[in-house]
């Protein structure tokens, strides 16, 4: 109290390693009145990149895309950071005693206040993905044939690499099951696979 100087514990049952919540409405307790909007699932910028090069029968192409200015709610963490579920290696940075991490809470099956959605779950959703890289060569440059106009061999990689600071499995989470409410919420979908392809273009 600013007038009397009296203090009051707003989380009287909190234990070392618990998540500390902020009393946003200053009523002295943590309740539904302290809930607010955190993060924005909508990118400020969506962009793409396409580069195509050719030289003496060789061709090279790169495509990529990305977003910037959005946040992701890593909600599947609520289901995996419990006593009998699987953990990610991130849990190695949890609080487990004085002087250890103050970023991740302690894991204790009897104290699960970290299960409430908070900014602990909100992360930067910016990313740039190299979606395709292709390298090819047209062997008709080496020999001429009146029957073959193109004999091109190529190799291609899809989903080559993603640049991101997001700690989840894939920052490109999309919309789960077509439901609008899942925009920006990572429900733990398995990320897209990297694919290697080899092919031939033959024209007569």
How should each PLM-predicted stretch be described?
Residues 57-61, 143:
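Repeated loop/turn-to-beta-strand initiation elements of outer-membrane beta-barrel proteins
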Residues 1-39, 158-160, 165-168:
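Conserved small-residue
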Residues 29-37, 42, 87-91, 113-121, ...:
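Extracytoplasmic loops and strand-loop junctions of Gram-negative outer membrane beta-barrel proteins
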